[in-house]
Amino acid sequence: MTTSGTRAAHRPSRRQWVIEAATELFATQPPDEVTVADIAARAEMTSAAVYYHFSSKDQVLVEGMRVFAAALREQVESLTEAHRPGSDIGPVVTGLVVWLSEHRSAATVFFVSSAGMSQEAEALRHEIRTQLLDELVRLVGKGREPVSEAEAAVIGLGVLALLETAAVSQVRGDDVYRSLGHRSFLHEVGRLAERIADPAAE
């Protein structure tokens, strides 16, 4: 602590505190209404300390998205690696939705709040979407054998669209999510994932 009661700027952990504080704010307010002063207050730092790590609030937003995206990608890779060949992919997709619910603020920022905020944010979203698609195609290949590369790519796109839609529905708590409740929502997401992956199984 400094004598003013705020946190010092230079410690490595302070950068993560800034990201976490900003993520909480961006998840509950329109990002264009959040100021560096707001972020500093939430992080119990001065604005100067925030600027020590980031040049602008937009940079904080993108870095928070990058941290979340890396964790999401790692989760997808881990679940895909552990997936038993030939088994349904529904549990993997619902597992991802559960993970997103456990990281609600960051998921809200990534899938909802940051949309259209900047070219850098959109470029990052596109980059991560491509990486997730590659991993989901690999998952489809493990879940359905044999499957052609083209078919796996199409199915992977469908699963990615489902995952993104489920993520938005969940973080917004929209009518569909509220009417089903969390448990039934997960069940339906898993069932839809399996139908997308193997329509003939219905």
What is each residue range found by the language model?
Residues 14, 57, 64, 68, ...:
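Hydrophobic/aromatic residues within well-ordered alpha-helical segments
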Residues 1-13, 20, 24, 140, ...:
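N-terminal intrinsically disordered/low-complexity leader segments
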Residues 70-73, 119-144, 153-157, 180-191:
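Amphipathic alpha-helical packing segments from all-alpha helical-bundle domains
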Residues 13-17, 21-59, 63:
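Helix-turn-helix
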Residues 63, 77-105, 146-147, 155-159, ...:
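Hydrophobic alpha-helical connector segments
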Residues 1-2, 98, 102, 134-142, ...:
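C-terminal peripheral helix-coil segments that are non-catalytic and often amphipathic
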Residues 17-25, 71, 91, 95:
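Pre-recognition alpha-helix immediately N-terminal to the DNA-recognition helix
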Residues 98-134, 168, 172:
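Short secondary-structure transition hinges
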